C-alpha cells in the first residue's frame, strides 16, 4: 500500500492558480476502503444515537434556542471595512493585472470567502463585527434629503423572505464557478462596485435591518456558519435586571438546535450553498467534462463550458432540492402519524461547511501565501510594507508524501465529521419533536440514507481525477 501511496505523489497535476477554488492534486488512494469506511461511520453514528438517545431522557432534556445574543457590528470596524473595500476596488482597477499579484481577487476569494468562512465556524460570527454594510448605511444617511431607517424602508419585503439572498448567492456562485475569469482584477472590481450600489439601494428602499437580516446573502451565510461555532455570545441578566452578554462556550454545532423553522426560501438558500460547493468539485472531474464532449487531458478552458456549467449548476440545485423533498415524502410515508421535523434543514449546514473546508483547503494553503506577499505591495509600486514582498511561494508540500497524506486525511475527516454532526443534529431535532424516541426512528432513516449517499459522493469527489 505504501508503494501505491508513494507512486501517486509523482503524478500530481500542477496547482492551477487561475481560480481560488481549484483542487491542487488528484488522490489515487484505495478509495473503496476510505469511501466505505466513511459511509460506515455515518451509519454507525445513527445506530449509536438510536441506542443512546432512544433509551434515555435526552429527548426531553434537549435545549433548543440557547440564549444567544446577535453580535452587533462595531462602528469603527465597519467603517474600516468599508474603507478597505473602496481601496480594494481601486486596487482592482489600478493595481497589477496579474490576479495572483493583485490584492483584490486574493482578498475576495482567498482571505474572505475561504479564510473568513473557516474562521467563522471556529470563532463565531466575525462578519457581523467587520461587515461594511452598517457603515454604508450610515454613509448614505449623511446625504441631504435621505433618511435611512434601521428598521423600515420605503417598501416592505413582505413574503420575499430569503429569496433575494437566494438569487444574489446564485449570481455569486455563477461568477465563481462559471464565469471564464472570476479572478480578473478589473472584472471583479466592477462587479463588487455594482454589488455595493445594489446593497446601498436595497437598504435605502427596504431598510437596512430588514435587508441585512434575510436578503443580503453573505450576512445570511456567515450567520448560519456561525451556528457551528463553539463560541457564542450568551445573554444574561445582571443585578439591576438589565440585559447583558458575555462570551460563552457550547458544544460545536449546538447552535443548530433551533425550534424556529426556516421558510421555503431559507431552505432553498441552504440547499443552494450545499449544491454550489458540490458542483464546484463536480465540474472539474473527468466524468463531467467527458459528459460534455470535452477531452479532460486537453481542457480548452472555462469559456467553452459556460453554457454546460450554467445548466449543471442549476441541475445540481434541482437534484439537491428534489432529494431533500423526497426525503420528507418518504419519511411521511413510512410513518404518516409523525411528520418529519421541518427543522431538518439545519442539519445540512455542517455538511455545507465540511465540503467548503475540504474543497478549498489545498488551494488556500498556497494562495494565502500570494495574499501575504500582495499585502506588502498592494499597488505594485515596489513597496514592502510588511516585509513579505521578497517571499517565495512554496507549493512543494503538495508533492511531499507526508504533507499530501495529511491534507487528504484532513479533507476526509472534514467530510465524514460533517456528516456525523448532521446525523446527530437531525436526530436530536427529531427527538425533540417526538421525545418518546422510538416512533421517530423510521422518520430518520431516509435522511440518514441521504447523508450516507452524500458522504460517498463527497469522498468520490476527493478521489476522482480532475482537469486543472
State where each predicted segment sits:
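Juxtamembrane boundary at the C-terminal end of a transmembrane helix
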Residues: 456-468
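Membrane-interface segments at the starts/ends of alpha-helical transmembrane spans
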Residues: 21-37, 100-110, 185, 254-259, ...
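Membrane-helix interface motif
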Residues: 14-21, 90-97, 278-295, 364-381, ...
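Interfacial loop-to-transmembrane junctions
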Residues: 419, 423-451
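Long, well-ordered mid-to-C-terminal structural blocks that present hydrophobic/aromatic surfaces
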Residues: 283-374
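Hydrophobic alpha-helical membrane-insertion segments
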Residues: 116-121, 267-281, 348-372, 451-455
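Hydrophobic alpha-helical transmembrane segments and adjacent short intramembrane/lumenal linkers
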Residues: 348-356, 360-417, 426-427, 435
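Transmembrane-helix bundle segments that line or gate the permeation/cavity pathway
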Residues: 2-4, 14-251, 279-280
